Structures are given as structure tokens and as C-alpha cells.
């Protein structure tokens, strides 16, 4: 079993249109993201800066926002669902 990552529409330009990605081996959210960065060129620049998530990017594990858990060190296990959700602004 793998960790499923939900990719929002705003980021699909760098994932080749993929809406989901499976990460086979990871024990933290940071490792999940590293797996995505290895797979999708340009994703890191869209969601991270200086080794941390950009402030307008929220990541959820099982519906819980990781900033209220252990951040990038939040534990994940097989079967978990990780959602990346950049904030959308408009006027």
C-alpha cells in the first residue's frame, strides 16, 4: 500500500495533469514531498521556499493541517491521504 497525494488543479501543470500521486516509501510529510519533488520537476519551486512550505500552501494528512501537528515531520503511514492545497486569492 502507498501514501496517496491529492494534487490540486493549480499544480497539475507541473505534474503532467496528474490529480493523484502514490508515494511508496515515506515516514513523514517531508519525505512524501521529497518523493514528489523527485518525480515532478518544478513542483518544489511552486510550494516550497528555503526548505519549508510557502506560507500560502497548506498540507493536510487525513484532514488535519500539518502546521497544527508536527509540520514536515508529521508522521505518515501506508494508506494515508495527503492533500496539498495552495490558497487561492482573488478580487
Where are these regions (language model features)?
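Ubiquitin-like/PB1-type beta-grasp interaction modules and other compact soluble beta-rich domains
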Residues: 1-90
Amino acid at each position: 500500500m502507498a501514501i496517496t497525494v491529492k494534487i490540486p488543479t493549480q499544480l497539475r501543470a507541473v505534474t503532467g495533469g496528474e490529480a493523484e500521486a502514490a508515494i511508496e516509501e515515506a515516514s513523514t510529510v517531508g519525505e512524501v514531498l521529497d518523493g514528489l519533488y523527485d518525480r515532478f520537476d518544478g513542483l518544489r519551486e511552486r510550494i516550497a521556499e528555503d526548505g519549508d512550505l510557502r506560507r500560502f500552501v497548506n498540507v493536510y494528512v487525513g484532514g488535519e493541517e500539518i502546521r497544527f501537528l508536527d509540520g514536515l515531520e508529521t508522521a505518515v503511514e501506508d494508506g494515508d491521504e495527503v492533500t496539498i492545497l495552495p490558497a487561492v486569492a482573488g478580487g
